[in-house]
């Protein structure tokens, strides 16, 4: 049952090499022993890209890679953070005065998001300090949600230190909201799957209210992650937040066109819901109401009957106020068609026809085309990698995560896995020194993993 608390598992640390190594490093760093450990997984989104923040369902699964944190509560009010990776410097601050710097999304700020989210949810003014050592094996900026996994892990760490309880759903909602402290206007998928994931199954994640339903993936095929080795730091770029705003503006213009009260409309799903029509019908409305040419700020103002000042101060966010044009038609087309593909994907998984793998693969291919052409969130390296994956046997391949770099996910018949991995290695990684150096963490088959939990030593 997804509404329960995150699990607590009692373990013999000596029997788990990664926990044991983390315990030893913690002792070396802080001169003491961790009281507990928390892990939160990364995720791969199988289908449903850039639609969670528009109100639509998505189908992700947790990967086996995760963020793992060793924790010791301390009597002082000092929060001390360290990382097993020397690339990420130590950080220390007072637990009662958390400041998150949006301008520089340094690693510790993601921890602070989760910490502050719990603090604000309970309205706490004084929090205990803690020593934390973080160990992550999710490739950063790869589209596998390493940053959200750290936010979720920090939220559960803080909750556990305080001795308080929340359900997985509540934690997911708090962490989704608190990640926005760093300036990323995400929709909640990453945090939801990190908490609600169950081993062996993907999940249909629905929003408002948040709920997760099992999606049984077909036997005889596996999902393979391949990293393009092009990093995209979501919070450090305006691409992502501009797309969020384009979807919001498209929703408002569509609502106005259909005679709806548009002022409070924020998501494309709200327009469909208010009109009470199907996704296919929403695509026809989009064709009728919006044009493919980019909209200037002045044209948007004319469509909505508002002043440029009102658009700038009441609708545009600080990080989109300098944009001169917005592609409303393309973004709405992607969102409504992708939302329909998610439902079709789930239906194929439920019906389990003989050609299920073929059908699911085609939906993934359609998704990538839409991400590339309508949402414009791909890049040449991702497109090349998708083509290579299809050439060597993937029934479907698409970018996963925000895009503009990061990973692809491919649906590969199980009996072709070995030859597929060897061929993709040769075609994409071999011969490129920087890609080859990262390949160990860049090309792997994965299966649905479990969600966030707490480890306590026996």
Curated annotation (Swiss-Prot):
It holds the Pfam family GalKase_gal_bdg. Monomer. The keyword Kinase applies. Its EC number is 2.7.1.157. It is an enzyme of class 2 (transferase). This is N-acetylgalactosamine kinase. Alpha-D-galactose binds at residues 43, 49-50, 52, 190. One of its GO terms (cellular component) is cytoplasm. One of its GO terms (molecular function) is N-acetylgalactosamine kinase activity. NCBIfam families: gal_kin. Acts on GalNAc. Also acts as a galactokinase when galactose is present at high concentrations. Belongs to the GHMP kinase family. GalK subfamily. GO terms for biological process: galactose metabolic process. It catalyses: N-acetyl-alpha-D-galactosamine + ATP = N-acetyl-alpha-D-galactosamine 1-phosphate + ADP + H(+). The record marks 43 as: Transition state stabilizer. The active site is at residue 190. PANTHER family: GALACTOKINASE-RELATED, MEVALONATE KINASE/GALACTOKINASE. Keywords: ATP-binding, Kinase, Nucleotide-binding, Transferase. ATP binds at residues 143, 145-146, 233-234.
């Amino acid at each position: 049952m997804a509404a329960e608390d995150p699990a607590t598992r009692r373990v013999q640390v000596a029997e788990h090499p990664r926990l044991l190594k983390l315990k030893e490093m913690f002792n070396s760093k802080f001169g003491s022993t961790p009281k507990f450990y928390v892990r939160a997984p990364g995720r791969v989104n199988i289908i449903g890209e850039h639609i969670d923040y528009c109100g639509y369902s998505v189908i992700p699964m947790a990967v086996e890679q995760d963020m793992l944190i060793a924790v010791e509560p301390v009597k002082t009010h000092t929060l001390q953070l360290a990382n097993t990776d020397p690339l990420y410097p130590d950080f220390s601050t007072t637990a009662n005065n958390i400041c998150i710097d949006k301008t520089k999304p340094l690693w510790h700020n993601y921890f602070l998001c989760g910490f502050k989210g719990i603090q604000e949810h309970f309205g706490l003014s004084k929090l205990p300090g803690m020593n934390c050592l973080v160990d992550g094996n999710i490739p950063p900026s790869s589209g596998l949600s390493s940053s959200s996994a750290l936010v979720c892990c920090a939220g559960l760490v803080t909750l556990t230190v305080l001795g308080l309880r929340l359900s997985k759903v509540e934690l997911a909602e708090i962490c989704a909201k608190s990640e926005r402290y760093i300036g990323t206007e995400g929709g909640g998928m990453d945090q939801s799957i990190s908490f609600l994931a169950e081993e062996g199954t993907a999940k249909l994640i629905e929003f408002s209210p948040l709920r997760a339903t099992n999606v049984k993936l077909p036997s005889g095929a596996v999902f393979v992650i391949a990293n393009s080795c092009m990093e995209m730091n979501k919070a450090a770029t305006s691409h992502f937040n501009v797309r969020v705003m384009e979807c919001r503006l498209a929703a408002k213009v569509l609502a106005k066109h259909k005679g709806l009260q548009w002022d409070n409309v924020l998501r494309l799903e709200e327009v469909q819901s208010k009109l009470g029509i199907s996704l296919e019908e929403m695509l026809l409305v989009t064709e009728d109401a919006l044009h493919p040419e980019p909209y200037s700020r002045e044209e948007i103002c004319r469509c909505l009957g508002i002043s440029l000042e009102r658009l700038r101060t009441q609708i545009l966010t600080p990080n989109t106020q300098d944009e001169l044009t917005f592609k409303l038609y393309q973004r709405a087309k992607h969102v409504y068609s992708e939302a329909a593909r998610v439902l079709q994907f789930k239906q194929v998984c439920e019906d389990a026809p003989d050609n299920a793998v073929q059908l699911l693969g085609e939906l993934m291919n359609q998704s990538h085309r839409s991400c590339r052409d309508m949402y414009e969130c791909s890049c040449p390296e991702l497109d090349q990698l998708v083509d290579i994956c299809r050439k060597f046997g993937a029934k479907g391949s698409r970018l996963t995560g925000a895009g503009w770099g990061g990973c692809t996910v491919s649906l590969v018949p199980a009996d072709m896995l070995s030859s597929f991995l060897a061929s993709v290695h040769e075609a994409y990684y071999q011969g490129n020194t920087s890609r080859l150096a990262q390949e160990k963490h860049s090309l792997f088959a994965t299966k649905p993993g479990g969600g966030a939990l707490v480890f306590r030593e026996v």
